[in-house]
Regions:
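Hydrophobic, membrane-facing alpha-helical anchors
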Residues: 18, 25-30, 76-90, 139-156, ...
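Juxtamembrane helix-loop boundaries in multi-pass membrane proteins
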Residues: 27-52, 87-114, 132, 136, ...
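A structural motif
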Residues: 46-74, 110, 121, 136, ...
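C-terminal transmembrane-bundle signature of multipass membrane proteins
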Residues: 47-53, 71-81, 209-212, 235-347
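Helix-coil boundary and interhelical linker segments in multi-pass alpha-helical membrane proteins
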Residues: 53-62, 116-131, 180-192, 240-251, ...
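Structural signature of hydrophobic alpha-helical transmembrane segments
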Residues: 63-75, 128-144, 189-202, 250-260
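A generic, well-ordered mixed alpha/beta core segment in the N-terminal half of proteins
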Residues: 114-154
Length: 347
């Protein structure tokens, strides 16, 4: 009888140890995946949130809500990564290109903040609206600090043509997402300043970036950052129209012309972009294309008000952009998920 009890007791102890081991294994697995979330994944979710706003404007609000929920979960996970793995994050942040892409985190927070303010207002949930507003202002402030540090470090203290890449625009012009999303924040003076700053920094940096791309070879790991050229001019178009209503026709026309040229460049380069085996840098294709849609939609509305016959053409171009961008964002999201969850190819 005692021997049977000992045997049963031993089996229970072994089973308990195995259960504890399994739990610890899962915890370590989840922590490992959390730590290894690549920085470009932030830009991909930024594109998803932007694209969901486009679909929301077309009437697909459920899809928008789903994307905003997924984006919220992702941002929380990434903030946990920053808190739990500061050494990993600082190592990423110390490298110029990943550092420039970290600005996408605050850009996501601006979009989410404006969304929750909208939801809180529409559904009569004041607390949610207040939270949204706080998140938005914190995101703008953090982005501003990051921007000042980035400019001081990479434009004045250290200058390296090899690390001067279009990804810089994520930091330099990314703060203009505040102008895209901040209409309900009662912060017009701030938005005016950001719009003027964004247009000026784009005009200053564009020839530098073009010269760099034409004269210095781009390494494969940064190849897809070339597509980011579409983002700053698109942000300028949207910001000018959002903030000023009827901006100077020459200024907004120039910015949109730059956006169209950048879009054509991306479309021509698509075969080259997809000649690479997938890696997180593919995310460089996503947000620029998504904000490019918003720029075309805003420009179509601007031209309609001006009575221009080009409005219909620009509106149709936006349709093509929605098609291309949806495919690109979906592809990058799926492939990033496969990398994160280590799904191998099947023969």
């Amino acid at each position: 009888m005692r021997s049977e009890i000992r045997i049963c007791g031993g089996e229970n102890v072994r089973a308990l140890k195995m259960a504890v081991h399994a739990v610890r294994y899962k915890e370590n697995l989840y922590m490992n995946r959390l730590e290894k979330i690549p920085v470009p994944a932030i830009a991909t979710f930024l594109a998803l949130l932007t694209l969901s706003n486009v679909y929301g404007g077309l009437g697909f609000v459920w899809f928008r809500y789903l994307c905003m929920a997924c984006g919220t979960v992702f941002i929380i996970c990434y903030i946990l990564k920053i808190i739990l793995f500061p050494k990993t994050v600082m190592n990423e942040y110390s490298q110029v290109i990943p550092c420039s892409l970290y600005a996408a985190l605050t850009m996501c927070m601006m979009i989410l903040g404006s969304f929750y303010l909208e939801i809180g207002t529409n559904f009569g949930i004041p607390v949610l609206g207040i939270i949204g507003k706080i998140v938005w202002f914190i995101a703008v402030a953090v982005h501003a600090v990051h921007l000042v540090r980035f400019i001081a470090l990479n434009m004045f203290l250290k200058r390296n043509v090899m690390t001067t890449m279009p990804s810089w625009f994520v930091t330099l012009n990314g703060i203009m997402v505040a102008c895209v999303t901040g209409g309900a924040m009662n912060a017009r003076p701030l938005l005016v300043v950001l719009t003027i700053y964004g247009c000026l920094i784009y005009v200053i940096m564009l020839p530098i970036m073009i010269w760099r791309l034409l004269t210095v070879e781009i390494k494969p790991a940064a190849y897809h950052t070339m597509a980011i050229l579409l983002a700053p001019c698109s942000l300028c178009v949207v910001s000018l129209i959002n903030v000023f209503g009827t901006p100077n026709a020459l200024v907004v026309g120039f910015m949109y012309l730059c956006a169209v040229c950048s879009l054509v460049f991306i479309i021509i380069k698509l075969p080259d972009f997809f000649s690479f085996k997938f890696y997180p840098g593919y995310a460089g294709l996503t947000f620029p294309m998504a904000i490019g849609i918003v720029a075309s939609q805003k420009m179509a509305g601007y031209l309609t008000e001006a009575g221009s016959g080009l409005a219909a053409c620009v509106g149709q171009l936006a349709g093509l952009q929605i098609f291309l961008t949806s495919g690109l964002v979906f592809y990058v999201l799926v492939m990033l998920s496969r990398m994160l969850f280590k799904k191998s190819d099947r023969g």
